[in-house]
């Protein structure tokens, strides 16, 4: 591609930036500005990063004490009338559209104990900060006291990730 001298910005993106929450993919983008001043060959690079945050749930031994349990996530992009639901059998993560600087995500845990525990259904609400290109896993496990018969849950957040850089070469005929 031949360009005149001047200032340019290259932008790359992939995915759809319209879904407030998705299980099938997310939007990534990146850009880089550069100047041409008579060079005959110019190589630039840019880094594309997700504009979504990734959330997962790990339920541990919940079937022992609860007949039903699930988590719903709320964000500003989902609005007040919509949530992303993680059912007890789900395994795929949710990708949540977030504000550029990140935002507080509300995780609401719904618990229905088995009848032998003579406890009412409960809801636990937790809020956690999440930024684009970041992830956390909500770890939920039962907490039962044999002596008192109290049934509850233990909740932890794991913010660990396994980042793998991927280099992509764009053929010149695509430009």
Which role does the model predict for each range below?
Residues 158-174:
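Short, low-complexity, Pro/Ser/Thr/Gly-rich segments in the mature regions of secreted, periplasmic
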Residues 15-51, 113-160:
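Structured interaction patches on ligand/partner-binding surfaces of diverse proteins
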Residues 2, 29, 39, 58-61, ...:
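Glutamate identity and glutamate-enriched acidic tracts
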Residues 41, 63-66:
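Short, structured coil/loop segments at alpha-helix boundaries
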Residues 47-62:
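A short, Gly/Thr-enriched small/hydrophobic beta-strand-prone motif that recurs across taxa
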Residues 37-42, 55-58, 70-76:
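Eukaryote-skewed repeat-based solenoidal scaffolds used as protein-protein interaction platforms
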Residues 1-19, 67-136, 171-175:
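Tryptophan-paired
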């Amino acid at each position: 591609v031949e360009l005149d001298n001047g200032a340019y910005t290259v932008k790359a993106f992939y995915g759809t930036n319209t879904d407030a929450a998705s299980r099938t993919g997310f939007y990534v983008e990146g850009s880089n500005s550069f100047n041409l001043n008579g060079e005959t060959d110019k190589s630039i690079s840019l880094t594309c990063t997700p504009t979504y945050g990734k959330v997962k749930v790990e339920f541990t031994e919940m079937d022992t004490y609860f007949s039903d349990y699930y988590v719903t996530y709320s964000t500003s992009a989902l609005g007040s009338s919509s949530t992303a639901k993680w059912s007890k059998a789900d395994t795929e993560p949710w990708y949540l559209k977030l504000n550029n600087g990140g935002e507080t995500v509300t995780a609401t845990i719904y618990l229905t104990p088995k009848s032998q525990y003579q406890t009412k259904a409960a809801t636990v609400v937790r809020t956690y900060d999440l930024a684009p290109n970041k992830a956390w896993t909500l770890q939920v496990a039962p907490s039962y006291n044999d002596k008192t018969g109290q049934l509850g849950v233990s909740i932890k957040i794991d913010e660990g990730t396994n980042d793998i850089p991927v280099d992509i070469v764009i053929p010149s005929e695509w430009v």
